[in-house]
Amino acid sequence: VSVRIFSKEKQGSGAFNGGEIVENKPIGFPQEYSPLRPYSNLFYWAHARALKDSTIGLHPHRGFEICSFVLAGEIRHYDTHLNEWRPLRAGDAQVIRSGSGISHSEWMAQGSEMFQIWFDPDLSRTLGKPAGYDDYRLEQFPTQAHGRVTVRLIIGPGSPFWLDTPGVQVYYLQIPAGETHRTELLPEQVLSAYVVKGAVMFNRQAAPSSAFALLAEEPRVETTTIEPSEVFFVLSPSEPGYATYGQGRMRV
């Protein structure tokens, strides 16, 4: 049974363009400091905030599925597959299936925030595939009410957002103060959770705003709010069933 909480101060950090964009990183790149190394089929996770309008220049990717989830404001995306800029706003999401290779650039408006999460879909399969891109709008994601809790399904059965990476489900929870939301976990699943707003307790362990939680070998996760809160959930397999790039890096 394992519940691990990492406050923002205990996460890795980074910046672009002289601090115009700042990041905290629950899962950093292998050469960076972060409290967690890649696990499951999660390779990288950063929470980026734009302090000014700023552009991250064109840069390449291969193999990974790189997802951006817009939390606030507006971002714009350009890549060598689309050859055009596309806007994304709060609640929207995108995936770059980088396959055999693609280059992209991002613009973030002042005050915007997003998660960028890299999933490992088994690079031995995807490095030979053509690259592709999809974006999805907030209104495309189904929502359900669980009592007073609103659950938005971003990735999983019933959502149009698809990944080659197996076994991934992504949810966005809006929870009023004093409520408890229960999530059942299969023995082969892990739950990665980020407190976007507010403050919660995961199985009675406190997690403030911007905290990251990793929960494994827990048959049930109870998320209890201390104040009105928004929480981002990723469910993924504890063992993906293939050799991940992160595992290879850790053996070096």
Question: Where does each model-flagged region fall?
Answer:
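Jelly-roll (double-stranded beta-helix
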Residues: 1-252
